[in-house]
Amino acid sequence: TDRHERFFLRLISKNTLLYTEMVVDEAINRGDKKKLLEFNINEKPVALQLGGSSPKLLAEATKVGEDFGYDEINLNLGCPSKKVEKNRFGACLMKEPNLVADCLSKMQSVTKLPVTIKTRIGYDDVEDYENLHSFISTLKATGVKTFIIHARKAMLGKFTPKQNLNIPPLKYEYVYKLKKDFPNEEIIINGGIISVDEIKPHLEKTDGVMIGRA
């Protein structure tokens, strides 16, 4: 979802919140900020998705994102790739809820924008609902109000990113239950949803739908 695709998507939908590709915090803090973050005003509303695990570096990147005019800052806790795991961000951070909470607290302390998260229902052999509930509870305590849940677990180091988009079974019921258990939070469902007809039933049980592939 680079700026060119987002411009095209905005022509199709005038109101949908669009997201950037995941951008690593250090790339923003040390790299060409304009090249990485500049976007056309017509793309708005648009969220900047960050990858990282350092509260300090994520906070710095969050502030840069706010200064560039983004409408939301999203922390990626769902990417399962080996490269991402090696650098300690993405889905592997589901193993470290307290670190994630520290990151989110620091990010929120430097911005007035909403800070949100995108994650999965579990990882490897950890896929029980109780663990997901505990993870979300820990993050909720920081003040985060919006949780985007890919209704598959992440198989870390075992599947390719493409396989992780298809092989782990979808468990939409986990996301529905999260909404029941966290009625005051915004719970958005993601995973395997590719048409408007498929969206409608999910909207009866969650607050929104994210489409990554269609």
Question: What do these predicted regions represent?
Answer:
Residues T1-A214:
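Flavin-dependent oxidoreductase catalytic cores
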